[in-house]
Regions:
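N-terminal export signals
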Residues: 6-25
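N-terminal maturation segment of proteins
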Residues: 24-614
Length: 614
């Protein structure tokens, strides 16, 4: 049951803007009380921008559960990944940005003005990105990359998992839509092909070690696709479960073999060609216009004007503070000799904190996660006044995706609740996880991290549910780890506490390594060694991590920048309110205000302070 504090009434009205037609989850938020012409005009503007967004991102409509009614045709479509398609998106972004910038927000309530400000910020960042000479630019999301197809980017990774996990099959029409999307998938692959060929013509070639990893994955994907693979298995299994008669498997197999596999082969051939001229230079400094791309990517990730030098120095300072805390705890549990990194490496070899190998260990990991999720759910009333109950599930990443994937990731489900929030865990080897680090990872990806935070957006305007800012999303997830600690997750577990601190220090390392690679000409090996030597991180994990920084420049910097800013705002609110400060009310402010850039987050905290003072 929702029980909002009166002090948050102004911020809670973020949830009062009406959902777009077709957003099915019932809201328990109070009805809107603002009915001025300016408010109505703002709602109309936000609705229209949201509809424009979905026209170019039909997958999002399905994932949110709003591909019904007037939007039903979107269920049969995939986004256009060709150069022409990207140009159309860029043109729409520029048009909608001008409308948002021209809108007079002076007469709006705080929540409605915030929504317009969020659109302005997200669309300005995207417009600036589209002005760059290359790259895969997102609108209000976290995955911006110079490389359209690489080890962790591309339709060959996104679409098979998406079709199996998010595309519903409840009736024959859904199965037909699935087949239509299979055909669109082949077109997506060729659209991407044209873009990576054009990028090569501009001198943009990914690092050789990324191409090698991508080619390994793509060859396996093409091999599986020629015989049908998961694309066929998914529709066969689900139509059978729903007793939907038809030759679905045979039709899917024909599309896979005749259209998708050849398109994959064409991408493979292009990357093989690029591999011949590729070097091991890891950073954007070695690419044409790379410094410009990195400056933009860093701004998009952090929503600040911090320079690479600023970010690098911040990471080094944060590491000193975190390692001082770790040093004290490590000494208390018998690890007194050597640097913090050396002691954490020794701790990782301690068999008491390891999971078993193979399937036995995988089962242990899933049981461990289940235990921690149950515990944290029970603690939520101690952290929030406004309660939600996320529908979530834990799933193993598809094995073919695991080599190029991080240890885990998570996100909220659909508006109507039919698609649960998912916590995807990489189980290619149990050595990726330890008993002192997995709880913290779980709190980050699921509850009270990404999955819980996403649940609070479900009554916001649709465009607000589509737009996200990396510094907020990941800053919140790190803050969620901190909340779990403050709620007692490690009260009787000092080794778990040091694992939590190591995870936060890991994000501080990212500030140093990401900027080191892209602005200070570090090699891939330097990045890996920094994590291992300084923080005692798992070499197997950080090799993939550093590869990720090479393909997603700047993205890794949003985590700690966002987390530190949230804590700065928390201390500001505490100082301003004194005895009136309530951490649960502050936490409500963060989640009810929605996903915002950091300057807007500060405005939301201003509003909370004003309301709490009365």
């Amino acid at each position: 049951m929702m029980n909002r504090r009166e002090a948050l009434a102004a911020l809670a009205s973020t949830a009062a803007l009406p959902l777009l037609h077709g957003c099915g989850r019932e809201s328990t938020a109070p009805a809107a009380t603002t009915t001025s012409p300016a408010h109505a005009d703002a709602v109309k503007l936000l609705d229209e921008i949201g509809e424009n967004y979905l026209r170019f991102a039909p997958e999002s409509a399905t994932s949110l559960g709003v591909d019904t009614g007037d939007r039903a045709a979107l269920r049969s479509q995939l986004a256009d990944r060709s150069a022409e398609g990207q140009q159309k998106i860029a043109a729409q972004v520029r048009q909608d940005l001008e409308r948002a910038k021209a809108f007079d927000t002076a007469g709006l309530d705080h929540a409605t003005r915030t929504s317009v400000d969020v659109v302005r910020s997200a669309y300005q960042l995207a417009a600036d990105g589209f002005a760059l000479p290359y790259g895969d630019i997102t609108v209000g999301s976290w995955r911006n990359t110079p490389y359209v197809v690489i080890q962790n980017v591309g339709a060959y990774l996104d679409v098979p998992r998406y079709l199996d996990s998010d595309h519903p099959i409840e009736a024959a029409a859904d199965a037909e839509a699935y087949l239509a999307r299979l055909q669109s998938y082949a077109r997506q692959l060729d659209g991407e092909l044209g873009r990576i060929q054009a990028a090569r013509g501009k001198g943009l070639v990914p690092p050789a070690f990324l191409i090698d990893k991508a080619l390994s994955q793509m060859r396996q994907s093409a091999k599986n696709t020629r015989s049908g693979g998961s694309l066929v298995e998914s529709i066969e299994r689900r139509t059978k479960a729903k007793s939907i008669a038809g030759d679905w498997g045979a039709r899917a197999r024909a599309i896979a073999a005749k259209e998708i596999a050849p398109a994959l082969d064409r991408q493979i051939a292009e990357l093989e060609l690029q591999r011949k001229s590729a070097t091991d230079d890891a950073g954007m400094w070695a690419r044409p216009n790379g410094d410009d791309f990195y400056r933009w990517a860093l701004k998009a990730s952090t929503t600040t004007d911090m320079t690479p030098d600023d970010v690098h120095a911040m990471g080094q300072e944060e590491l000193k503070q975190l390692h001082a805390q770790m040093d004290t705890i490590l000494k208390s549990v018998g690890y007194a000799s050597g640097s913090v990194g050396e002691r954490m490496t020794a701790l990782a070899r301690d068999k008491r904190y390891q999971f078993s190998e193979g399937d036995k260990g995988r089962a242990e990991i899933l049981a461990f996660i289940d235990e921690k999720v149950k515990w944290i759910r029970a603690q939520l009333p101690r952290a929030f006044n406004t309660q939600v109950n996320p529908n979530m599930e834990v799933k193993r990443l598809p094995p073919e995706e695991e080599p190029g994937a991080p240890t885990a990731y998570g996100g909220a489900g659909s508006i109507d609740g039919k698609i649960p929030g998912r916590y995807w865990i990489n189980l290619r080897t149990t050595e990726l996880h330890s008993r002192y680090s997995l709880a913290d990872l779980t709190f980050h990806e699921s509850i009270p991290g990404h999955i819980l935070q996403g649940e609070y957006t479900r009554t916001a305007p649709l465009i607000r549910q589509l737009l996200a800012f990396n510094a907020y999303s990941e800053g919140w997830a790190l803050y969620a780890q901190q909340l779990a600690d403050e709620l007692g997750a490690y009260a009787d577990d000092p080794v778990g506490k040091v694992g939590y601190l190591q995870a936060i220090a890991f994000r501080a390392c990212r500030l140093v390594v990401d900027t080191g690679i892209h602005a200070k000409r570090w090699t891939r090996e330097q990045g890996v060694r920094f994590f291992v030597d300084v923080n005692g991180s798992n070499p197997m994990e950080v090799a993939s991590e550093v590869d990720r920084y090479c393909s997603w420049p700047g993205q890794a910097c949003g985590y700690k920048v966002g987390h530190s800013e949230i804590n700065r705002q928390r201390e500001r609110a505490r100082a301003a309110l004194g005895q009136r400060y309530d951490v649960k009310a502050f936490n409500d402010t963060l989640v009810l205000g929605g996903n915002v850039p950091l300057d807007v987050l500060a405005n939301n905290v201003d509003e909370y302070i004003r309301a709490a003072k009365g």
